[in-house]
From Swiss-Prot:
Its main location: secreted. It comes from Mus musculus. The lineage of its organism: Eukaryota, Metazoa, Chordata, Craniata, Vertebrata. Residues 12-47, 50-85 form the EF-hand domain. This is Protein S100-A4. GO terms for biological process: positive regulation of canonical NF-kappaB signal transduction.
Length: 101
């Protein structure tokens, strides 16, 4: 039986490949594929913003090598940044129960 972290890694990889390669390179997300992934898999990230300028900024920030596509490494960096933001948010929350030392 897979452990929760192993399952999470599987979801990260399989979600990328679910959307990549529908058009063009099967190992990269183009703009359309990325927008579909974010809209369906991370709806709270984009929120109600559906304007093209906001999405273009997200794409530009993710596309570190400026090839107009997001490869798996760029996708993982993006997810890592989201995870760090979530962690920082929860660091400010008091524990409900004292932590064991």
């Amino acid at each position: 039986m897979a452990r929760p972290l192993e399952e999470a890694l599987d979801v990260i990889v399989s979600t990328f490949h679910k959307y990549s390669g529908k058009e063009g390179d099967k190992f990269k997300l183009n703009k359309t594929e990325l927008k579909e992934l974010l809209t369906r898999e991370l709806p709270s990230f984009l929120g109600k913003r559906t304007d093209e300028a906001a999405f273009q900024k997200v794409m530009s920030n993710l596309d570190s090598n400026r090839d107009n596509e997001v490869d798996f490494q760029e996708y993982c960096v993006f997810l890592s940044c989201i995870a760090m933001m979530c962690n920082e948010f929860f660091e400010g929350c008091p524990d409900k129960e004292p932590r064991k030392k």
